[in-house]
Amino acid sequence: MKNIRNFSIIAHIDHGKSTLSDRIIQICGGLSDREMEAQVLDSMDLERERGITIKAQSVTLDYKASDGETYQLNFIDTPGHVDFSYEVSRSLAACEGALLVVDAGQGVEAQTLANCYTAMEMDLEVVPVLNKIDLPAADPERVAEEIEDIVGIDATDAVRCSAKTGVGVQDVLERLVRDIPPPEGDPEGPLQALIIDSWFDNYLGVVSLIRIKNGTLRKGDKVKVMSTGQTYNADRLGIFTPKQVDRTELKCGEVGWLVCAIKDIHGAPVGDTLTLARNPAEKALPGFKKVKPQVYAGLFPVSSDDYEAFRDALGKLSLNDASLFYEPESSSALGFGFRCGFLGLLHMEIIQERLEREYDLDLITTAPTVVYEVETTSREVIYVDSPSKLPAVNNIYELREPIAECHMLLPQAYLGNVITLCVEKRGVQTNMVYHGNQVALTYEIPMAEVVLDFFDRLKSTSRGYASLDYNFKRFQASDMVRVDVLINGERVDALALITHRGNSQNRGRELVEKMKDLIPRQQFDIAIQAAIGTHIIARSTVKQLRKNVLAKCYGGDISRKKKLLQKQKEGKKRMKQIGNVELPQEAFLAILHVGKDNK
């Protein structure tokens, strides 16, 4: 056991985590040169296209160190994006140490900080690594000082390497073996294994990634899931070298995969503890704290026949993604679907894209909203995650919106632009600290503004230099209103949005104008209105198509023309009473972009 090292790699987006893992796999001979490819651990097509890591992946390698010993390295590559920070915390729970990778050109960024603090809270040994020293812009001395100044760990003798060229990666491994402590645990004790992650394989059923804390797990053992008490047979187990390799046993301190032929998706929840049925452990390991979704949106299949397939797909996806929340929802405009909760807009986009790709579904998304806390006049507190669930105006005593605490790191040159943006987003500054030429800003900004397009606009005002990390702080009373959209006097529930009263007029007008361009013209006038309660705040009309009924009159008497026009008018009136309007899919997407283009 003293030769096992469990660690994960944490860093900001694009600081080279996945490339460094490629090099480590290559040096330790996990894959032959023929099988080696860039970002070998990003197995999803989506990850490769966007160049980001979404799922954490684990690998077991053997490394012969300079002291002649052979060490078993279990390492986990983690995502860097703020929406996937829960993936990072789950991976860290399985480790004793972490490599903090910092780009020697860019320096410390917000995510570096957030992930590093997560690691320190879990008492992990953090080993700083300066990557990309082959770049002409690299300044390792300055960055080492920055790490010490901002993060607070000693980085004077931090390992310097370039994952792209392979320089210094050997030193990284040596430092790992030296600085990261071996796992603790009792190999003879009753089995306790933590489920770090699980996913669904169409042939094997549920595959779980586990870390053995105490005891030993052998092939063919009867294992018990501690939260549900159900027992399963350990059919196959093994390690990833990144390929799946079968083993006969997993020993104390190791990380590996396990297949128990579990058909039910909820059979082995992430964060649960496995133990042996015949010699169970007394208590479960502390799991992970459940992450609360921050953004909710309705997802509906375009054709209602896909509803069953959509439900199964969501079930399989939620096994792989512990933070996805969903419940059935029906809408008069869109039929049956699900209300889904996500950690942020990127997460929402990724989930929607994965559903469309991996499960071949066509989906419509409604506008994303956040959760509001509503105190009704009867003093009851309810949580509202969709505009249609908001009680009537006269029943609301107080409406509170979620406030996010946003930590931003940015160069001084962009400070003015960023502050202007934060104020426009109704933000309140709580802290500002200068570190060299970097500024650490802390703002409290309403979550609704953060999830709309704050991240994109922060990046564009600061030319991509600012970085953001945000978390939910509290609920705060605020003057929010629901803007309904009426089409020919009928409310369309899927188009409603909740917004601040100050912005409501603009938002309403903008939405109505957008809808006007998207709804095809019919034989009668279509009135599109935005309303708060019964008060109409904006209106536009899609004009009718009409035939020229006067074309056949030659010269002709004025009364003859009037008669024909009058007849046409009456026909249109009758048509309007019975006609209904088909809304194209673009109309629903229009709301997603309200408040974005005109800035």
UniProtKB/Swiss-Prot annotation:
Gene Ontology biological-process annotations: positive regulation of translation
SUPFAM superfamilies in the cross-refs: EF-G C-terminal domain-like (SSF54980), P-loop containing nucleoside triphosphate hydrolases (SSF52540)
Enzyme class: hydrolase
Subcellular localization, as worded in the UniProt entry: Cell inner membrane
Catalytic reactions of this protein: GTP + H2O = GDP + phosphate + H(+)
EC number(s) on file: 3.6.5.n1
Bilayer topology: Peripheral membrane protein
Binding, GTP: D14, H15, G16, K17, S18, T19, N131, K132, I133, D134
Domain of life of the organism encoding this protein: Bacteria
Gene3D superfamilies: 3.30.70.240, Elongation factor 4, C-terminal domain (3.30.70.2570), Elongation Factor G (Translational Gtpase), domain 3 (3.30.70.870), P-loop containing nucleotide triphosphate hydrolases (3.40.50.300), Translation factors (2.40.30.10)
Gene Ontology cellular-component terms listed: plasma membrane
Entry GO MF terms: GTP binding; GTPase activity; guanosine tetraphosphate binding; ribosome binding; translation elongation factor activity
PANTHER family for this protein: TRANSLATION FACTOR GUF1 HOMOLOG, CHLOROPLASTIC, TRANSLATION FACTOR GUF1-RELATED
Family label: Belongs to the TRAFAC class translation factor GTPase superfamily. Classic translation factor GTPase family. LepA subfamily.
Name of protein: Elongation factor 4
Taxonomic source organism: Escherichia coli O1:K1 / APEC
